[in-house]
From Swiss-Prot:
Coiled-coil regions listed: none
Residues that span the membrane, as ranges: 33-53, 74-94, 111-131, 150-170, 180-200, 237-257, 266-286
Highest taxon in the source lineage: Eukaryota
Family statement: Belongs to the nematode receptor-like protein sre family.
InterPro entries hit by this protein: 7TM_GPCR_serpentine_rcpt_Sre, Serpentine_rcpt_epsilon
Name of protein: Serpentine receptor class epsilon-13
GO CC terms: membrane
PANTHER family given in the database record: SERPENTINE RECEPTOR CLASS EPSILON-13 (PTHR47518:SF3), SERPENTINE RECEPTOR CLASS EPSILON-13-RELATED (PTHR47518)
Its membrane topology: Multi-pass membrane protein
Organism of derivation: Caenorhabditis elegans
Amino acid sequence: MSFNISQENEFQTMYIKYFNKTYSIIEGSYNYYLFVFYIQIALIFIVLFYYLLNVYIDIKTCQFSTNTQKIHHAIYLPCVLGHVMCLIQKILLIKDSPAGDDMTNPVFYYISLFRAIFCFPGFYCLSAFVAERWFATYFLNDYEKNQRTWLVGLILWIIYSIAFISALDFHTAPSTVIHVTIFILLSCLAYLSNYLNFLLNRSYYYKSNRSDGGGYSLAQRFQISDNIRFSFFFNRLALSIAFFQISGPMCLLIDNLNISRSWKNLNTVVFDTILLLYAIVTPFVIYHHNPKYRTELQKIANSIRNIRVRTNKNQIMPMDSLDESFNSLRIQDTFGKTIVFNVTEQTSTYFEKLDRAWS
């Protein structure tokens, strides 16, 4: 694929992301940016190490069983590969390679294209998670036992197709407004869809708690509770990454403005930094709410510090009373509220039922 100089003006603002090194040297800001580049390279290696650590722990704890986990890993890997493309961009730029900032160089184009293809699915991750939960609600009868792996393939095929088409069009379109609009619109729809899914499952939950069970089986009630818990998790995840979901596309939108090359260079560096922090914060939030992951990570940390790990999962520290022992377990209901035990009342109720059963 060949390029000529006349194409530069057409594609100049559409690359992921173009940094004009020559202009930066002329204005005297390159040394400052070079320092930032080295920090970004260090962050990329942290992202790569963090990814390998997460995959290792997931393999040890068998975290590939649910559709949600499969979708997470299928989107997580391309994002990491996108940062590998970013690493190559930085190295070529620092080494004064023609492929580092020469838009007429085919290598520069393909690195930018592959980086976009790998990174764009990250902007659609919330939509993918919510879509899977709607399928879980629709197939309420047996979703716990039959998760229908083909659903993962369908969701990922749609996500990857949109990302691929967006990346190709991004490098030829005269404006990035439509791409940014799609990114933000899908994120907003994901928030709304998650809330509607929560309301629907909450109504199912209240029906299932009737004295007659509402006609729901035990498996259905479990799935309803699981959907509600996921809605709360989604809210925490969405709030944690909302800044990145909005600021990243906004940086792409700024490229359409008629601003100086100096500001565009700054915008490029800010965009790269946002994506790097996004790649660290998102998996951290996801894994922070995973008990199996936290337990295994603690074991690894303890082994590094040569501290013996206690394997008794249900160990209860000595308490002044039995009530404190029960309450120290911090058992929560479906909606995340802590259940407080009144041991005396619970014991009396238990023996009354037992006495009636023996009578």
